[in-house]
Amino acid sequence: MSSSETPRFGSIIWTDLTIPNAEELRDFYAGVAGWTAAPVRMGTYADYQMNAPATGESVAGICHARGVNAGLPPQWLMYISVEDIIRSAARCTELGGTILVPPRPMGSYGTFCVIRDPAGAVAALFQPAKTSS
């Protein structure tokens, strides 16, 4: 998702695959889905933005389980856009969920956290950065 897009609150806006070896599965999904990869520098390593073959549109991320993703199990992680991440994280715990990664910045894009719902499924909440008009 680019920083110029304004996501609709409550929508699934992105998905990342978080795994120990991003290069291995980058190549797997490039072969299976025809995606092309664009590296995203993360300091000493790169994660990957995966793009659709026909349009070049960004469709997913393939990320190392390091940095902000350290400690996450291998999984596809969907991001749900919320208006107020602090309020949504509080509601998560009030309703029986768990905060796995507390709210933290995601570069200039906004703020995210990772939650586990009462059934054990994991998702991320994302509050986009405020843009000046």
Give the residues covered by each predicted segment.
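Vicinal oxygen chelate
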Residues: 21-23, 54-55, 78-119
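N-terminal beta-strand motif that seeds the catalytic metal site of vicinal oxygen chelate
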Residues: 1-26, 75-80, 126-133
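Conserved short beta-strand elements that form part of the metal-binding/catalytic scaffold
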Residues: 2, 35-73, 118, 122-129
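Conserved beta-strand and immediately adjacent loop positions that scaffold enzyme active sites
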Residues: 14, 47, 77, 112, ...
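Residue-level "edge-of-site" marker
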Residues: 42-43, 105-106, 133
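Core segments of cupin and vicinal oxygen chelate
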Residues: 6-9, 13-57, 94
